Amino acid sequence: MALLCSALSNSTHPSFRSHIGANSENLWHLSADPAQKSKRRCNLTLSSRAARISSALESAKQVKPWQVPKRDWFPPEFMFGAASAAYQIEGAWNEGGKGPSSWDNFCHSHPDRIMDKSNADVAANSYYMYKEDVRMLKEIGMDSYRFSISWPRILPKGTLDGGINHEGIQYYNDLLDCLIENGIKPYITLFHWDTPQALADEYKDFLDRRIVKDYTDYATVCFEHFGDKVKNWFTFNEPHSFCGLGYGTGLHAPGARCSAGMTCVIPEEDALRNPYIVGHNLLLAHAETVDVYNKFYKGDDGQIGMVLDVMAYEPYGNNFLDQQAQERAIDFHIGWFLEPMVRGDYPFSMRSLVGDRLPFFTKSEQEKLVSSYDFVGINYYTSRFAKHIDISPEFIPKINTDDVYSNPEVNDSNGIPIGPDVGMYFIYSYPKGLKNILLRMKEKYGNPPIYITENGTADMDGWGNPPMTDPLDDPLRIEYLQQHMTAIKEAIDLGRRTLRGHFTWSLIDNFEWSLGYLSRFGIVYIDRNDGCKRIMKKSAKWLKEFNGATKKLNNKILGASSCCSGVTHGGGTA
C-alpha cells in the first residue's frame, strides 16, 4: 500500500493524530492498543459499521452502465497498470543472498506489533512466483507494472563496500525480461520502506547524513544494471508516511522506540524532531540520486521522480479558520516534500510552526532539489475534513503531526461523512477529492506531470466488517475504481492534461505492514493455504474487460513469451 497504506496502514497514521484536548469523539485520537482501536475506531459500533458497509454493497450493485468508465475515454498514451512493493510480496527474506531489512527486524523482534502477529518471510512468494504475477498482469491487459527493488537484496549490508549481491541483480533482470517480453512497461520504485538493517545498526539509517551517500550508491547500482530496461524511476515511496510512522509514532519500522504491546515510548523530543531530520536526509538523498541519474544515465528517454501519499483535505466548516486549516494540512502532507523540489524550501507554514526543529538547506542543496523530478507519483486512497485547532501557548505539541494545528475529521461540521465506508477502516470513498487534488497540484505546484501510482481499497477480515464469504467477490472495489477513474477523466477534461497513468493498488494480496494479512488490497487473491495460488477477483475480471484483454487473449497474445512457461525462480530458469 503500498499503505499505506499503501502506507496508510494504521489508524494512527501520522497525518491523522493531532491534539484534541477534551474532544473524545475525535476519530484519530486513539490508544495504540489494537483492541482499543477496534472498539473506538470511527465512533461506530461494530454492528452499525457492518450496516454501513452492507448499504454500500447494495449501492455498488446499482452503478448505471453510463457511469462505468471506458478505456477510450483516456488518451492512447495514458498508462493503466498495477503496483506492488518488494517487502510486501517477495518473501525469500533470507534467501538468494539478501540481507535483512528494517522490516524483517521489526516483525521478527516485535511480532506483537503486527495485528495478526505475522511477517513477510514468505509473503506472496513472488521471488519464486514472479512469472505468475506477470501472467496475471498480461491476462488482465495491464500496460505497466510498478514494483520496488529491495535495497538489501542488491546490497545486503547496505553499502557498496559490503558488496553487490549478483543473485539479486539476476532476480530483477529476470523479472524485467519477463515483463518486457510480454509488452508490460516497468516502473521501478527504488525505496519502498525496506531499509537495510545493517545501516540501522551502524548509524541509525535515515537519522544520519551518511544515508545520502549510501542510498545514492545503491541507486547508482540499479541504474547501472537495470537502466537499459527501465526508463521510469521513482526514488522514494510515501516519505510522509515513512517519516511519521517509522520515526514519529514508531508504529512502523524501524520502530525500536516503541515497547512491546504497541505502547509508544518515543521521547517527545524525538517524536517532534526526528521525522523532520529523516525527511530532510531523504530529500537530500533524492536530490543527489536525481543529479547522478541526469548526468550519467538519463539518456534521451529516461525519467525520474518521487511518489507522495496525498489527501484532498476539505474545510470542516464554511469559515476562514477551517479554510486555513485545510491549507496547512496540505502543506504538511504534500508540500513537506513537494515544495522543496519546486522552490527549494519547505512551506512557509511549516517554517513558522515547526521552528528550529525543521532543518535548513544550503544554497547548493537547494539548486539540486529544485526541478529534481520529471514527474510526480501520487498515492490517493481517501480524504478528510480539516478542522482548525487554536494556536495557543496552552497547547504543547507531543508529536510531529501536532504541528499542523489541524484535525482530520471523517464528518464535516454538519455530521456528513466525506464519503461512504468501503470496507477498509480508514478508507471513505471520495473520488471528487482525487479530481480536486489533481487540479490543486496544477495551481499550487507548477503543473507537474503526474502518475496516480496507487489507488484502490481493501477487504478486511474482522474489525466490524461483515463475514467474508467469497474473497473473489469484491463489488466495492469495482465501484471504487470506476468512480476514481471517472474523476481522473473529469480532471483531464478540466485542463489537467499532464496526467500520465493510473496504477491500481495492488496487483495481488500482500503483507499489509502493521495489519499483516488481515487487509487485502489485491485485485488478485492469494490463497495462502494452497501454495500462494493466484486467483483473479471480480475486480480483475472487470479491469480485464476495461482493458480489452479478452480480445487480446482470443488472439493468443497471452503466453506468447517463453518467460511465463513456469512459476519458479532460479537463475532465470523455470
From Swiss-Prot:
It is an enzyme of class 3 (hydrolase). Pfam families: Glyco_hydro_1. Expressed in caryopses, coleoptiles, primary leaves, and etiolated and green seedlings, but not in roots. GO terms for cellular component: chloroplast; chloroplast stroma. A beta-D-glucoside binds at Q88, H192, N237, E238, Y381, E454, W505, E512, W513, F521. Gene3D superfamilies: Glycosidases. Optimum pH is 6.0. It catalyses: avenacoside B + H2O = 26-desgluco-avenacoside B + D-glucose. Disulfide bonds join C258-C264. The keyword Repressor does not apply. GO terms for molecular function: beta-glucosidase activity; identical protein binding. GO terms for biological process: carbohydrate metabolic process; defense response. Inhibited by N-(3-Dimethylaminopropyl)-N'-ethylcarbodiimide hydrochloride (EDC). The active site is at E238, E454. Homo- and heteromultimer with P60B in a 1:1 stoichiometry. Aggregates to form the fibrillar stromacentre. Belongs to the glycosyl hydrolase 1 family. Long fibrillar homomultimers are formed by linear stacking of trimeric units. The multimerization of the enzyme promotes formation of a long central channel with narrow openings at the sides. The active sites are localized inside the tunnels, constraining the accessibility of substrates and products. This is Avenacosidase 1. It comes from Avena sativa (Oat).
